[in-house]
Amino acid sequence: MHKKIFTGLILLGLLTVLLASCGIREASPVSGPTAKLIGANFLQDTMTIKKGEAIIYMNESTSPHIIENGAWVDGSMKKEVETGAPTVNMDIAANASETTPPFNTAGTFKLYCPIHPGMNLTVTVVE
């Protein structure tokens, strides 16, 4: 009888160690420049990043966004990939995030959301 209890306790201990070693890892924290999308706007409509960095877009709203090269100008969409800018064409679902390609050229670049009028972001890339 005692032998069965002792064996059961040993097996239970081994199972506990095995399960503890398979613990759930927390997600990696977001690192790098971040643009937050709140409702139909960028939280900040300008940002400065370093050459070679990418931008992480965090959609904190319940509506999807599309981020592309260009800008809203006088109420009209002006789609344009400026010289030196990475080509950006991202669909970002509600409460999700996406990352652009890196900005490898210094300069000022425009990005916008074509489904939300007036939603523009100006990115300044420095050396």
Protein language model features and the residues they cover:
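Sec-dependent bacterial lipoprotein signal peptides
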Residues: 1-20
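Extracytoplasmic copper-binding redox domains, predominantly the cupredoxin/blue-copper superfamily
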Residues: 2, 21-127
